[in-house]
């Protein structure tokens, strides 16, 4: 998972 622009990318 990555966090980009304060959103969690799963």
Curated annotation (Swiss-Prot):
Protein name from the UniProt record: Unknown protein 19 from 2D-PAGE
């Amino acid at each position: 998972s990555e966090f980009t622009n304060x959103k969690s990318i799963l």
